[in-house]
Amino acid sequence: MSEASCLASPLLYTNSGIHSDSFYASLIDSATHKAQLKQIHARLLVLGLQFSGFLITKLIHASSSFGDITFARQVFDDLPRPQIFPWNAIIRGYSRNNHFQDALLMYSNMQLARVSPDSFTFPHLLKACSGLSHLQMGRFVHAQVFRLGFDADVFVQNGLIALYAKCRRLGSARTVFEGLPLPERTIVSWTAIVSAYAQNGEPMEALEIFSQMRKMDVKPDWVALVSVLNAFTCLQDLKQGRSIHASVVKMGLEIEPDLLISLNTMYAKCGQVATAKILFDKMKSPNLILWNAMISGYAKNGYAREAIDMFHEMINKDVRPDTISITSAISACAQVGSLEQARSMYEYVGRSDYRDDVFISSALIDMFAKCGSVEGARLVFDRTLDRDVVVWSAMIVGYGLHGRAREAISLYRAMERGGVHPNDVTFLGLLMACNHSGMVREGWWFFNRMADHKINPQQQHYACVIDLLGRAGHLDQAYEVIKCMPVQPGVTVWGALLSACKKHRHVELGEYAAQQLFSIDPSNTGHYVQLSNLYAAARLWDRVAEVRVRMKEKGLNKDVGCSWVEVRGRLEAFRVGDKSHPRYEEIERQVEWIESRLKEGGFVANKDASLHDLNDEEAEETLCSHSERIAIAYGLISTPQGTPLRITKNLRACVNCHAATKLISKLVDREIVVRDTNRFHHFKDGVCSCGDYW
C-alpha cells in the first residue's frame, strides 16, 4: 500500500463510513499529496457526495495547488450545474497554473451557462489577461467590472493596475490607482503601481510613488522593495540602493531569493561586484537568475576572467546555462581577447542546445572578431542559417574592426539582396570599415544613406564620420558636420576632431575641441594627453609643459602602457618598464636581439615622438621598453617558430612601435596581430593590414 493510502485510509473508512461535509472539507485541507485527494474523491463518489458544490470547490482548489489542473477540471466537469464557487475555483486554478487561455475560456463558458460573476471572479480573470498581455480582453473585463459594480473592490482594482502595467498602459494603471480612496490603498495597491513604473522603464516615477507610500506610513513588503531596487539599478544610484539594502536587513528579509537577486544585480550594475559576490555566496543553492546576474555583472564591469571562471563553476555545479549565461560568457571571452578561450567557448556552444540560436551566433561572431580571427567570425556567420539583421550586422562590424572595408561593403550588398533591412549597428560597422580604410567617399555615402532607412545617427556614427573626414584632412567639413548635429556632441565626437587636428597640426581648432572635452569630462586624462600630442606635433614645447603642469595640479596621472600576449591559451601582461616577470632576463636578451636586428634592418626611431608626446607608449626614455615590444619578445621565446603572435594593448599603437612591428614580422617570419584601442593590426612580411592608416 502506498504512503498516501496509508495516510488516508484510517480517516476515510470509519465504523459508520459516513461523515459530514465539514469532516471531508477538513480532510481535503489537510491533504499533503494529490494521491490523497483522488482517494478522498473516490470516497465521495461512493457516498454520493460528488455533487456537493462545497466539497468539489475544495477539491478543485486543492488539486490546483498541487499543480494537477487536469484532475481539477475532471472534478469540475462532474458537476451537472455548477454555481459560482466552483466556477471561480477552476478559473483561479487555471490562472494560478499559468493556463491563461483556459481561464478565459472557462469564463466564456460560465457566461454561456448564465452564471453571474462576483468580485472573486475578476482578480483571476485579470491575472489571465495580464499573463497573455491581452489588452483588448482586459478592457472588456474592466468594462464588465464597472457595469456590475465591482469597480470599488480593492482586489479587482489591484488586478487592473497589474494588467495595465503588463500591457504598458501606465496612464490607465495610474488612473485606476488614483481612483482608490486613500484608506483603501493597501500595500498590494502601492506595490502594483510602483512595480508598474519600475518594470516599464520609468524609475523616477516609481521612486516618487514609493516616496508617497512611505509618507503615508505604509510599510513596504519584499515585492515593493524589489521594484524600488530595480528602479535604483536603472538609475545606477548606489547610495539609495544601499539605503534599501539596510531596510531589507532591518526587516529581516535578506534571505528572500528575489530580493537577493535584485540586490546582487543592483551592486553588480553599480560596479560593486565584490559586494555582489558576498551576497551571492550567502545563497546555499543559487538559482539560474543569480548565476546570470553574477556572470553578467562581472562581464559588464570589466572582470572578464572572473565572469568566465563563474561560468565554468556554474557548469561544474550542474546548473544548466541559458542564453543570458552563455552570451555573458561569450562577451567576457571577447574582452579577454584569447583566441584559444574563444575556440573553447565555440566548441561548448556547438555541444549545447543553443548551437542554432541566432542571438548566440551573433555574439560568437563578435567574439571571434574581437579575438583577432575574422576567419572564425565568418565561419560562424556561414554556418548560421537563419540570419537576421543582428547576425549580418555583427559580421559587418567584425570586418570594420579589422579595416576590411571591401568585405564589409560586399556583405552589406548581399544583405540588401536578401531583403534584410539594415539597422544602426549595420551602418556603424560600415562607417568603421570605411574609416579604417580611408574610404572617405564611400563612408560619406553610407552616412547619408542612413536617412533613407529612417535611422537617426547616434554619437558613435558622428564620431566615425568626423574621424573619417578629419584623418583625410577635411577638418573644416568635419567641424561643419559637428555644428549641424541635432544633439549635443559628446566626448567621442570632440575626441575624434581633436585627434584629427593633432594629425594635421591644426592647433586652433584642436584647442577648441579640447576645451569642449574639458567642459564635458574634466577629469579624463586622455583629453589632456591628446592636447599635449597636438602641441608636440606642432613643436609648441612651452604649451606641452603647460599641459603637464595642469595635469599635475589636477592630480591626473597618465595611463600606464600595458600589453598582453597569448601563449598556450594564457594571457601574460607586460607594463612599460616592468621587470617583475620571472623570465625577465630572457625577455631582456630577446628585446636586445630585436633592437639589434631592427638597426641592421634600417629602422630609425622617431625621437621627437618619444621624448615629447605625453602618450605613455611614446613617452618612455628608452624606446625598446615599450610594452608591446616586451610582449612580442616574450611571445618569440615562448612559442614555436612560425606561430602567430596575438597582442592586446590598452593604448593606441604608437608610431615607433607600429613601424618596428612591421619590420619585426619580416625579420622573424611571423604574423603578429595587435589589437589596440582603435582597431586591429595584422602585421605580416613587413606590411600592416591598416596600410599605415590608423
UniProtKB/Swiss-Prot annotation:
InterPro entries named among the record's database cross-references: DYW_dom, E_motif, Pentatricopeptide_rpt, PPR_At4g14850-like_plant, TPR-like_helical_dom_sf
What protein family does this chain belong to? Belongs to the PPR family. PCMP-H subfamily.
Q: What is this protein called?
A: Pentatricopeptide repeat-containing protein At3g12770
Protein source organism: Arabidopsis thaliana (Mouse-ear cress)
Q: Where is this region: Type DYW motif?
A: 600-694
So where does this one cross the membrane? none
> Which UniProt key words apply to this protein?
Repeat
* Residue numbers spanned by region Type E motif: 493-568
Q: Single GO cellular component annotation?
A: mitochondrion
Does the keyword Repeat belong to this entry?
yes
Q: Which GO terms describe its biological process?
A: mitochondrial mRNA modification
**Type E(+) motif: region residues:** 569-599
Alphabetized Gene3D superfamilies for the sequence: Tetratricopeptide repeat domain
Say if the entry is tagged with keyword Repeat.
Answer: yes
Q: Which SUPFAM superfamilies match?
A: TPR-like
Which one of the record's GO molecular function terms can you name? Answer: zinc ion binding
**A UniProt-annotated Pfam family:** E_motif
Q: Where are the PPR repeats?
A: 52-82, 83-117, 118-152, 153-183, 186-220, 221-255, 256-286, 287-321, 322-356, 357-387, 388-422, 423-457, 458-488
Domain of life from the UniProt record:
Eukaryota
